[in-house]
Amino acid sequence: MALTLDIVTPEKRVLSVQVDEVRAPGVQGGFGVRLNHEPFMTALEPGRLTYVEGGREHHYAVGGGFLQVADNRVIVLADTAEAAGEIDVDRARKAFEDAQNRLLQLTEQDESHQAESARVRRAAARLTVAGR
């Protein structure tokens, strides 16, 4: 028996697969889920979501969202989700640099500071997952 992992973004269902384990970046720290885990729900930070299938790890960059565990099913409702091999590193690097430059021009009191900070975290997660 295995866990069912579903990753969904506003645009599409990204993945539906049977897995042995899921590790995700929660807002209160990283955590793992295995078979028969207690039900819970948490918010996700931008970062690396890893699942293990048949002893092999697979990595996704998620741009925040929510994760729910119930009845051996893990549902990820992510703002964005990209498999490591699908990440355009040049585009991610440019997005990171652009967001970082915009953030440096803002103070924490600026209305757009929080949004730019989130853009930096999402782009950094994509670069990390892509291995760059």
From Swiss-Prot:
Membrane-protein topology: Peripheral membrane protein
Gene3D superfamilies in the cross-refs: F0F1 ATP synthase delta/epsilon subunit, N-terminal
An annotated GO cellular component: plasma membrane
Top-level taxon of origin: Bacteria
The keyword Ion transport appears for this protein: yes
CDD domains: F1-ATPase_delta
Keywords carried by this UniProt record: ATP synthesis, Cell inner membrane, Cell membrane, CF(1), Hydrogen ion transport, Ion transport, Membrane, Transport
GO molecular function, one term: ATP binding
Entry keyword annotation includes Zinc-finger: no
Pfam families assigned: ATP-synt_DE (PF00401), ATP-synt_DE_N (PF02823)
Compartments where found: Cell inner membrane
Self-association and partners: F-type ATPases have 2 components, CF(1) - the catalytic core - and CF(0) - the membrane proton channel. CF(1) has five subunits: alpha(3), beta(3), gamma(1), delta(1), epsilon(1). CF(0) has three main subunits: a, b and c.
Summary of the function given for this chain in its UniProt record: Produces ATP from ADP in the presence of a proton gradient across the membrane.
Family: Belongs to the ATPase epsilon chain family.
Protein name: ATP synthase epsilon chain
Organism: Anaeromyxobacter sp. (strain K)
Lineage: Bacteria, Pseudomonadati, Myxococcota, Myxococcia, Myxococcales
Name of the gene: atpC
